[in-house]
Regions:
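Hydrophobic beta-strand segments within extracellular beta-sandwich modules
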Residues: 1, 91-92, 215
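Generic structural detector for well-ordered beta-strands
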Residues: 21-23, 30-35, 49-51, 78-82, ...
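Intrinsically disordered, low-complexity linker/propeptide segments enriched in Ser/Thr/Gly/Pro
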Residues: 1-3, 231
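N-terminal non-catalytic regions of secreted/periplasmic and cell-surface proteins
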Residues: 28-53, 120-142, 146
Length: 231
């Protein structure tokens, strides 16, 4: 901008325009959810990401710790929530305001669940050998399989979780034995059995003739909360 001053005798002077400009920006940023919060999860400081076509200041419906300061770049920006309580989050929003003060569209984040509750305490059930000459409470040279049965609580959060058997020789520490198994909906409120080979047993640290092997299990829910059973 500039100005012309004219006196009463019609003499005029045009002012200097230095420092009197306005940049015109009436276009709002456009943003979208680029990476959703992992769900369900026991992470109380979850992460998500947005894509913006402009840099600008981020506004989120919850407190965030990153980025700090809370500014988005043109492109993908990863955002980390401050500590959240356990629960279901279905109305969290994010927007961006550019340097000119234009506000973007408001994005509602995909619903996510934070679950910090571990599975209930449990006691490992039966341990039964099979193959060859079966004698209760013994693993002999003719046995080929040891089946460990574990009770599974009727808790929907366990569906998609895992069951891992552990074992130890007396005087040693518990260690994973065999592969973990996925807990299915049909296992809820019942039991789940894991078959171990004699080779699995013989690979335990300290295994030898005359030793005693103790079994336990770890149940982990779909949010990665875990509980170790009583042997």
């Amino acid at each position: 901008f500039t100005a012309i001053i004219t006196d009463s005798s019609s003499n005029s002077t045009t002012g200097t325009a230095s420092g009197t400009t306005l940049a015109v920006d009436q276009t709002a940023p456009t943003i979208s959810e680029q990476t959703v919060v992992t769900t369900p999860s026991n992470d109380t400081t979850p992460t998500f990401a947005i894509t913006s076509n402009e840099a600008g200041a981020i506004t989120v419906s919850q407190t965030i710790t990153s980025p700090s300061p809370a500014n988005a770049i043109s492109g993908n920006t990863t955002i980390i929530f401050d500590t959240l309580a356990a629960g279901t989050y279905n109305s969290e929003t994010v927007s961006v305001r550019d340097a000119a003060g234009n506000d973007s569209n408001t994005v509602t984040l995909t619903t996510f669940v934070i679950d910090t509750t571990a599975p209930s305490a449990f006691t490992v059930g039966s341990v039964i050998t099979s193959g060859g000459n079966v004698v209760a409470n013994y693993l002999n040279g003719t046995n080929t399989t040891v089946t460990v049965t574990v009770p599974i609580e009727n808790d929907a959060t366990l569906t998609g979780g895992t069951l891992q058997i552990q074992a130890k020789v007396t005087g040693q520490d518990f260690e994973n034995i065999g592969s973990s198994a996925t807990i299915l909906e049909g296992n809820l409120g019942g039991t789940q059995s894991i078959a171990l080979t004699d080779d699995n047993i013989e690979a335990l640290t300290g295994y030898a003739e005359g030793t005693t092997v103790t079994f336990t299990a770890i149940i982990t829910d779909s949010s990665s909360n875990s509980t170790t059973g009583t042997a």
